[in-house]
Amino acid sequence: MAKERSGAVTMRGNPLTLIGPELKAGDAAPNAILLNGSLADTSILSADKVRVVSVVPSLDTPVCDIQTKRFNEEAGQLGDDIEIVTVSADLPFAQVRWCSANNVDRVICLSDHREMAFGNAYGVHVKELRLDTRAIFVIDRQGKIVHAEYVKEIAEQPDYAAALKAARAAAAA
């Protein structure tokens, strides 16, 4: 049974339970298989690029919308050594529809819907909602986490500047 972290995050002040470990900078990034927009299995790890993994509960909510659009804008300024991946428990079809409707084309969207494998491995699976909580992980080319943020209040935005700074530093290393 996966570890449960009661009260690890809140939604509008109400405590929620996260399933899985709390990962920190320096930890090895677990691999997890997610679905892409074509329903193909896709690994969260990338051997040749630094990855900013932006985790959102659902693209169809206001803060998740803002977060994903913000990272799409930032992706154009990061260069070829860094890629941004958005993970949510939305169906892959919903992710494709949302990206198309919002002109989001520089972020890779991957779905954790099938097994919540990513959520369980990265400690972002919200037990009460079967969604992933808001978080950001930066993973270097060697598969090490160099930045991790679990946003305490799901309705708040993450620290974009800290994640982007960590990604740029990892790409320059």
Give the role of each language-model region.
Residues 1-173:
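Chalcogenol-based redox active-site neighborhoods
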